[in-house]
Amino acid sequence: MSETTDTSTAPVSTDTPESSEATQTADRNRNRSTTPGSEHFKEFISTEWAERDEPLPAPREQAAFAAARRAKVSAAFPGLRLVIPAGEMKQRANDTEYPYRAHSAFAHLTGWGSDSEPGAVLVLEPSGDGHDATVYFRERAGRDSDEFYANPAIGEFWIGPRPSLAHVAADLAVATRDIRDFDAVVDRIDTATLVLREADPELTERVDNARVRFAAEKALSENAQDTPFSIEFNAEHEPDDDLARVVSELRLVKDAFEIAELQAAVDSTARGFGEVLAELPRITSEVRGERVIEGVFATRARLEGNDVGYGSIAAAGPHATILHWTRNDGPVVPGDLVLLDAGVERDTYYTADITRTFPVNGTFSDVQRKVYEAVLEAADAAFAIVKPGIVFREVHAEAMKVIAKKTAEWGFLPVTAEESLEPENQYHRRYMVHGTSHHLGLDVHDCAQARRELYMDGTVEAGMVFTIEPGLYFQPDDLTVPEEFRGIGVRIEDDILVTADGAVNLSAAIPRTVDAVEAWVRGAQG
């Protein structure tokens, strides 16, 4: 990795959130900087660059959908200024950062995904009966600026071409302004302003301080008049929480663009799974075969999308009984099962979330088959009831009927299946402690701030996309099950689209039945 340079000469406004980070980076790097500082160098590097030929793009496909989403948010908050940050880079160690990902609400309301600019902010400013939308981000510096070559965080010599304000305005079909102009927004902030708090803590603090300042000045002013849309803020920031709730609930029902992106993410994930199977000979030859699985799938995710949508679970043998095994440092042994839970995230940030469990040697043992078919029966039972009008939690309840029935039939429960299903018992949940379904979209666990009455207790609607993912997990040291069951973990997870009269399994093309999975594994070997 190239040595970072001293950013102390970069022209960073002292009023912007970037300034403190840039200054800290500069301070850390001064002890090893070799950045040329001579006037001859500065003159030489700032001249003789070709003119950029950058025709403005047509609006991207999702721009119209993003505008419609903004209109819905606007209608929910008449007269209030709304601040939705994209968020800043997150430090990994010293002067290295994690790959940037904008906040999902920002992406949803702008259509800006993996090519978005760190530190950008969407502001919906009250105007008439609605709002005017503006995206603020840092305009790129000219080649005659120190920023171009001396700022490793944003200089184009370091990170590559950055978009102009005009380019982004045309691309997203929304007004844009330089982030320095956001200072004027902060100066106008009053208590009729809401901010999406979790997206950018430093920016949120600026908004909080501005609201407090406005309230104090208003209280001290003898001639102050009430602001028509003034609202009280308590320590829990409830009005801001309302904004987080609305933008989260807006994503419960997907539009046509989102559904197409989710299907594309599923299709890419299917290809990634197939490539993992093709590499099984190499995977089984490595001490950390699970890491090879993770790497093979990640390659497909980077080729066809932005990244993996979450930490891939490549769990072989007894690791499959650990629900979120992301360490992925174990061997992959013929005769064992592999539980692969992974999803490709598109450049738009929409992600798949698929799990398949397969035998390393291409053949399920008798007990592996028994467990697998029980989980498949639970998944199919849950899918069979999905249609508009049911309550979301019924999907889980249907799967649990099968899990309780099977574990009771095998003699693992101290009561009958019916008794175990009673809320005060739930013995069968020892072998499946997680839920069966969650909403899917820009986040793998989408709509996280939605109210329970609209999520778990909500009515299923056409356009919703969620997972169905029952499983059975028998820990290696679980004395309630026979020895031959111990160390077996099986999960089958599909991504489900609710239609007008039923549902479609978006991942149905990825083999699910015992015979199909065995043929899939064997066929991938050539």
Task: Please place each PLM-identified region on the residue numbering.
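Active-site neighborhoods and metal-handling regions in enzymes and metal-associated proteins
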Residues: 1-526
